[in-house]
């Protein structure tokens, strides 16, 4: 097999293998700012750019979970992708992560038996 055919086949396998599984994003556990480390303590989901204030409510009051199918469909039609915004203790700085189109759900909260906050979409 020639070098070009091998490269083409490898590229195709790489692209299609990624399409079968949902990409996962997660808020970093900490944010470094000068000499201070800030811990993750909150997260929100937005339809469109966060500066436009299109914050979405979680599915219910007992758990911070967002089911994404309807939001993803609407976002594709309207050109408003989803954004996960990560917030940290004692700073106004945030981390904004674009939610992959393949994601089905986002979750946030405290880890079991822990004070560590988490937020991710997959």
Where are these regions (language model features)?
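Intrinsic low-complexity, intrinsically disordered segments enriched in polar/basic residues
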Residues: 1, 20-21
């Amino acid at each position: 097999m020639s070098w070009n055919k091998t490269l083409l086949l490898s590229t195709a396998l790489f692209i299609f293998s990624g399409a079968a599984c949902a990409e996962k994003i997660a808020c970093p556990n900490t944010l470094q700012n000068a000499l201070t480390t800030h811990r993750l303590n909150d997260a929100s989901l937005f339809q469109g750019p966060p500066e436009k204030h299109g914050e979405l409510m979680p599915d219910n009051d007992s758990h911070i979970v967002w089911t994404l199918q309807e939001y993803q469909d609407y976002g594709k039609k309207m050109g408003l992708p989803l954004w996960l915004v990560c917030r940290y203790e004692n700073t106004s700085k945030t981390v904004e992560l674009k939610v992959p189109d393949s994601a089905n759900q986002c979750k946030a909260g405290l880890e079991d038996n822990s004070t560590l906050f988490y937020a991710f979409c997959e």
